């Protein structure tokens, strides 16, 4: 599989610097993190985009969620995301610096927004490995997909693999452990 100018697979390693939402909603910090990724030798930087109204229930977004944990997390997600224009600026900055910009869309409307950026590939979060409607929407872009498998059972992974194969999608699975730091007995790199 190819992503941009990079051929993915043996013997080549494709290094993705996971920025996610660690920029805390600051465009300046996001750009500084891109520079740090370049200095570290990364091939790609990866961000996240979500349309909060598409992903979360209105009740939760209106601060009427059933628990404080949900309210706390949603508040952080809202405060720590970049706007569409800021994502576009980061993508353009990456192009000017010679590093690939990639993003994890959490919903179909984010996919549609990101398609305007002409990004080379999409990353699917572990939490969305079984979100077949989202994956189907991503497949229609004809872009390569990198899908994380954290928290998924072998049968869930197989369902998604069969789904992608049936659609002749270009994809790779990214072995992912969703516990940080991961206990050695959970690493399972030989699967």
What are these regions (language model features)?
Residues 1-191:
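Catalytic cores and adjacent flexible loops of soluble metabolic enzymes
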